[in-house]
Amino acid sequence: MTAIKDDYYHVGLTDEQVRKSRDEHGVNLLTPPKRPSLWKLYLEKFEDPVVRVLLVAALFSLIISIVENEYAETIGIIVAILLATGIGFFFEYDAGKKFDLLNAVNEETLVKVIRNGHVQEIPRKDVVVGDIVVLETGEEVPADGELLEAISLQVNESNLTGEPVVTKTTVEADFDEEATYASNRILRGTTVVDGHGTMRVEAVGDATEIGKVARQSTEQNTEPTPLNIQLTKLANLIGKIGFSVAGLAFLIFFVKDVVLVYDFSSFHTFRDWLPALQATLQYFMMAVTLIVVAVPEGLPMSVTLSLALNMRRMLSTNNLVRKMHACETMGAITVICTDKTGTLTQNLMQVHEPNFYGLKNNGQLGNDDLSKLVMEGISANSTAFLEEEVTGEKPKGVGNPTEVALLLWLNSQECDYLALREKATVIDQLTFSTERKFMATLVQSSLIGKKVLYVKGAPEIVLGKCKDVMLDGKRVDAVEYRSTVEAQLLNYQNMAMRTLGFAFKIVDDAEASDCVSLVAENDLSFLGVVAISDPIRPDVPAAVAKCQSAGIGVKIVTGDTPGTATEIARQIGLWKPEDTEKNRITGAAFAELTDEEALDRVMDLKIMSRARPTDKQRLVQLLQQKGAVVAVTGDGTNDAPALNHAQVGLSMGTGTSVAKEASDITLLDDSFNSIGTAVMWGRSLYKNIQRFIVFQLTINFVALFIVLLGSLVGTTLPLTVTQMLWVNLIMDTFAALALASIPPSESVMKEKPRKSTDFIITKSMRYYILGMGTAFLVLLMGMLFWFNSEEGGMTTYRLTVFFTFFVMLQFWNLFNARVFGTSDSAFKGISKSYGMELIILAILGGQILIVQFGGAVFRTVPLDFMTWMTIVVSTSFVLWIGELVRLIRRLTQK
């Protein structure tokens, strides 16, 4: 916009120019990501591969139902589909509502602009391109633009570049060439921490840097989740087995009872063809029944329940899961890309070490004159202040984070900075600027009753204006002591700390009363150096070690300098003495690499410094190309594209709305430690799903071959449709609840991440399903032959015993499935597992009710007490054999 000349920025836009600008460049609102409609959200649940197999099974079942006029099985499958999809839909919708509440943004914040020659306040959303905006300390910048005036202006860019304090200027000679954005550019979403200025708006809404990042963050990640890949494989396998067995059975029966029985050459009328057609239809329906039996209706239910329960439990530990799949995907991650500020560190500047050379008691303030000078110097020579303390909470600061850190240190020394500031009469003040690199304040001191000049700033600059150094009650020549101070500064810089030097001068009444003249005399006394750091979160080193021991690589991606990033990596245990330059890179150097060159380096990288948002996004995509499952943590808008493209995006609860919108999980407590916990939940969840598959497929294996072999030997269908409904749906649902509610185990963190290409059914699972399934099949087929050979054949009583025996085998097998993959006893912790106890009672109670009162609907007759006891005790061998195997395993492991 060129309607305003720099010389006339104090006039601003006219109302007509505002209207034209808004028409041309739009309003200052970020377009919110398009939310899927409720019906689309629900239809997404049908993308589950197993649900799709269920839909095919429901269609075949419906064909049989129409022919036989028996709809129980069809209704059962449809109920299973509706339950599985409905639960997933409800939990994601519920999480979405919670997220919207968490992420409420207020676009009505008032902004000072110059229009029609007057300063006026307007809502942030009404700012247009060309507006002249007045910026004050503590205010958020409403749009992107060019600075027209900058007086000691410092900006917090941590949500865009990771830098908490960036100095801005309009003097080209003072531009920071290494800065991510030009020194005279100021961006929406950043905050003025010190000084003031005036800007001309050049971009609003989606055209701002934050808007561009937000738009990138809405680009959808097309990477399928590890669980989805496995369920697709499983659904394909089940489909192939079901259709193969059904096709083979149909072919055998069709040849045996149709092709070899009927002479087709003698058929002349439709009536002649009818018997053959009826037999063909009967065998076709049997084949379809086999397909229906083969499909594990309870699998989507189990997966959904497991994910839903995890969502709820993780919310109770301050982790808001927005996307249900993220619960499980966390268990498969192999790489975590994390930013530094606010994630690894506390994003709160603190005094690490006060080094006032003349103070005694290890830098503790006392009642001596030097302590008084330090206290008054920090209090009066500052523009920051602390907000009033809320009982039980630390006071919060407003202003330059470095100055706030100094005030917080005074506060911790039980010094009332505000009282000192109010008592000290300011005679003259020189605010901090990038040109001077120091701040000076001349006050009439209430503590010593004299005029005192206080100076603070870059230590090397302040020391250069001193003639002596206050050291243990003596004055030492500043030139002689300079090398000692420089060595100290170098040590602090290597520890990724900011440093400030402090000096003072007692001014006689006859001397000048302006700071510029007094400082120019170069006869100050140097008080010492204060090291200020953004400390790492206390739980981060242990959390990083936990992730590394679990086989997960951690990479720091930050806008900070290489030195600072490396020091933070060292402090958290990521950077080791043996690491070299191949383990770190700058964003600019990374951008220059071709994809082939970058692919060779990405797995070795531990640190990317001076990174821009696009660098982080590219890193994530290249890691995925290398087969990594990537989680990204971040709290700034700059993290949003990478958060969205990663398999799991983890935003911080105190992060920006754009970052949270792009993430899958929001860590409400901002704790990096929660990531390790989420990995543990995810891995345990995957094991629970595997346990359910073991239990479920054993049932399906047995049921499939019972129907097939039972038909081959010519017996009555051993299990009716309604009985199969109980076994396949009701028991599966109970089992899903029981196995999904198993709490996470710390032991999973000692394992390496599974490969996303590894099939969900492991070798041990295959052996268990085939071994246990074959044993059950031999037993049950033996029962069928025995009952058929007995006088009276297959009576309803014998079929009831057979049905109950079959159910009780699965009942005891549930105990084995609960501890599958471990050497623990099936009874370990069961007294605390109230869910499991209730489900055991529900299955037993349900079976008793069906047998005793099911009658014709379930084709059962009541059994006496002794028969019940015989079945329950005889089938329990399943559990005792499992217990013996696990006991032997425990003994051999010792």
Q: What positions do the PLM features span?
A:
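Conserved cytosolic headpiece of P-type ATPases
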Residues: 1-752, 758-761, 774, 803, ...
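Substrate-binding/catalytic subdomain of NAD(P)-dependent oxidoreductase enzymes
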Residues: 441, 714-728, 765-808, 815
